[in-house]
């Protein structure tokens, strides 16, 4: 498996990608995944580079603390963030165990998330990043919250991410909490 930056070269491979979520599939297939204004997309390819196993898309942002003064909301910056806009594994490979480490099973979803977190650590050397943020689907919540220590946004936190699928969970992780930081 290889995880590489998504380019037009791989666009024909998106036809077979299906993670079970229309919005997440459509982002990859529509061409938005190639739009740098929408973030940078990375794909997990088969060894033969002829199949997309999974992908993620990241962009930068900021996490603010909301303070209510009278009738006004004031936004106090808490720190820069890398937003995981999308992260998905093809439905044929979901729940595929790759390894076991200290009694903990490691799945493809954990593997691609770890690659994303390593990329965040690399970016942190050049730009201010305090958080990794994401909007999780109900199906993905277990991967992030329970298996990889992402926390639910507090009521007084905001990152201004607007998603057309508002049924998800807003989660964050301090970059300092990424193993290997």
Model-derived segments and their meaning:
Residues 1-103, 111, 115-137, 142-181:
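Non-catalytic substrate-recognition and accessory regions of acyl/acetyltransferase enzymes
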